[in-house]
Amino acid sequence: MEGFNIGGKSLKSRLLVGTGKFASYDLMKQAIEGCGTQVVTMALRRVNLDHKEDNILEYIPKDTILLPNTSGARNAEEAIRIARLSRAMGCGDWVKIEVISDQKYLLPDNEETVKATEVLAKEGFIVLPYMNPDLMIAKRLESVGAAAVMPLGSPIGTNKGLQTKEMIRILIEEIKVPIIVDAGIGKPSQAAEAMEMGAEAVLVNTAIATAQNPVKMAKAFELAVRAGRLAFNGVTAPQAKVARASSPLTGFLHEGEA
Amino acid sequence: MSFYDTYLEYENFDTEGFLKEVKEPDVLGIIKKNKLNHHDFLALLSPAAANCLEEMAQRAQELSLQHFGKTVLLYTPLYLSNYCVNRCAYCSYNIDHDIKRKKLTYDEIEKEAQIIAETGLKHILLLTGESRIETPVSYLVEAVKIMKKYFDSIAIEIDPLEKEDYQRLIEAGVDGLTIYQEVYDEEVYKQVHLAGPKRNYHFRLDAPERACEANIHNVNIGALLGLNKWQHEAFMTGMHANYLQNKYNDVELSISLPRIRPHVGGFRDVYPVTDQDLVQVLLAFRIYLPYVAITMSTRERGSLRDHLIPLGVTKMSAGVTTEVGGHSDSDKGDSQFEISDTRSVEEMRKAILNKGYQPIFKNWMAI
């Protein structure tokens, strides 16, 4: 499958994986390795360098790109501080901006996300902002240097799929940097749907981590993402509202014909 | 406007009459709802709901997986002092009790911190009895400065403070507040808090809100189950959490379900709370407030705590001693109450893994 580009890096896998909520780090590692993902996101606030068994970095394959996220940040200032700390801890230049000030629905704060993205992009970070799909905000994120834009399909952890489908479709049409659908994807079929629409990639966590068999589910997502991308490239056949054969309004013209 | 206004709305509500009217089909219908109202929540505490515990458990597990996954955060309390100026009928620290009093020096605090840190824990809860003279905010600020060398997350469980004092502690490095109302019923509150500043019901009730206004990161509340009818106390606790969450969106809320434990003193006027009651309360909290963390302390025995993990518990204490200086085994002060689950951090880590859950040592860091 053809690759895509984020921040100058060419990626083959279009499935990004999140690391929260797994029953163990061993299981998480197996899921990551099994699905061939090249980008793995983890909450920097959870990175525990002092404790080998609790240190998530020990379980992420070395050839994977780390995408530390700013989970826990309630405003731009906190997100910026976490990103800088992440770089100082040796977690690289990639960062997923998560600014969430609503602990109930965990919806992102778009305004603060733009502010953090602007500052960090100027500092040379590869910034992937998680956002509520909104065209004007996505354009601003793009203009201030986001390497990709990550709209939510539905709220984090809900597994409700592409509830924001129409907004994501507009972002895919209008935004030049990659659109990566993040949050809410609950089933491989929903990931495939996002890919069929033309998303460059998807990020999945809860649906894999809390599946009965996370390793199998990660593999299923990999296949679904590939299938969806193939379908996008193959350009799906157009839909018709009525069967072509029937002509309920003009059929009378043919009455009496053999 | 404070939570007291909400409390007043329900002060004369016929809770028992309402609970009697709830039928099992009502409960099964409520479980399926996306958003529960106050009465739905109360219905989950009814006798009819007690007959639907398995259905409630299935729903609670589903919601816990969605919001928290298969993870349990580990922390431990560190008792700094058992000096107290209050006369609480149910507490060993009661000023009238002849227990061995002790306050840790800064050197002793550091020694305790070093020993706890060796277990790998990164979250610590600092506790004191309530004495502004023995443990003023300045003492706590110094203790927090020492803790910062060893721990990523520092919470406090101390006497209620003014907003400015919470701000001082937050600036020093505190990110969490635990404060139990003990009992929400105002009359019962007066009966069990015989003397001392803790008798001020309102100052305690509004303490979590003052901490929220001071921009604290997380708040843990609860009622001491056993001081009053558990249905009433669980209902008010849930309502309080809901009030705080709606008003302070960015604060992470937790609820604890402490049951009264053996202690020094003669208070025996306890309303029984069985294991089944405790499970019902836990499930009702999870279904009503799927996004709040739920803490289960070592007051409960190990086997029960293990069974509660898949039902929605997200935080557990481990390696606990409630004695002042209890970790470093030096000259200890007497404990606040007897714990039940005496497992070490390593034993708890293994127990959580055995349940198919991931023990988390670090979930937060001061930024």
UniProtKB/Swiss-Prot annotation, chain A:
CDD domains associated with the record: ThiG
Reactions catalysed according to its record: [ThiS sulfur-carrier protein]-C-terminal-Gly-aminoethanethioate + 2-iminoacetate + 1-deoxy-D-xylulose 5-phosphate = [ThiS sulfur-carrier protein]-C-terminal Gly-Gly + 2-[(2R,5Z)-2-carboxy-4-methylthiazol-5(2H)-ylidene]ethyl phosphate + 2 H2O + H(+)
Pathway(s) the chain acts in: Cofactor biosynthesis; thiamine diphosphate biosynthesis
Taxonomic lineage of the native organism: Bacteria, Bacillati, Bacillota, Clostridia, Peptostreptococcales
GO cellular component, one term: cytoplasm
Identification of the protein by name: Thiazole synthase
Pfam families attached to this UniProt entry: ThiG
UniProt EC number: 2.8.1.10
